[in-house]
Amino acid sequence: MRLVPLSFVKNRRGRCLVSALIIMALVVSSFVLPVHISKSSAAESTSSYGLSNPTISNGVTTWDCIYFGNYYQSNSSTKEPIKWRVLSINGNDAFLLADQNLDNQPYNNQPWADVTWATCALRTWLNETFLNNAFSKDEQNAIKKTLVVNENNLEYGTNGGVDTTDKVYLLSIAEASNSAYGFDSEFYEDSETRVAMNSIGEAGFWLLRSPGRYSASVALVNSVGYGYGYGGISTDTFSVRPALHLNLSSSSLWRYAGKVSSDGSVDLPTPSPTNTPAPVY
């Protein structure tokens, strides 16, 4: 009688156990089992606030929108509600981008001066002049302070400067080409996902916070959604399209504004019924 080493028996048992587990896994994987998955905070916020992350179908991006704050748009004497696109939802946080360009401002006041987002005049204008003109004190309190990461220009290596903490800011090249936010992932090409209208009803150039090819230039998006890396910093013909993070739990300060799509279509919300009965004639 040939003796079998104990190690062989253990190894054989191990191989048998592994084989049995593989067979069980194959059997289980052939069925679609109902599994209870707890909702994430993002999913809960989407259902509780009625807002969703951007969706892309057949190359067309659709964003949910809200009204929040008021600013001069169609004229310089009357403020109108600001419409924002929802770029992302995470719990009670909504990352918002203005649906259209809201103003024309230079990135910096001194031409050909080395500048970054941290030191530019537009950052000050957004967080002082615009913030105070567009939002009430309660609305300002609902806007979250955001740690803004200022990366170098990946194409040219231009210095992006130090990170900042802002309530209102501009998108970066990386954010304006982030498909999770509904944008075309290729920055240097035409894209309807990046087209923004001016208040006069024409598509315009809008500024980003990222540096351009040189330290005295800034990145921007043109009227057909193409990304540029050499905008003049003191030019006052480029538009401002603000971004911010809103605390959605301040629900009395904002309201749903329907949906917009990159193909130009607009889906307005259904008006809420009034409690006042219609007159009978």
Question: Language-model features: where?
Answer:
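N-terminal secretory signal peptides that target proteins for export/translocation
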Residues: 1-13
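Residues marking helix boundaries in flexible regions
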Residues: 5, 23-24, 38, 144, ...
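Sec-dependent signal peptide recognition
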Residues: 15-23
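Hydrophobic core
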Residues: 22-30
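Signal peptide processing junction and immediate N-terminal pro/mature segment
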Residues: 32-43
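Collagenous Gly-X-Y triple-helix signature in extracellular proteins
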Residues: 44-281
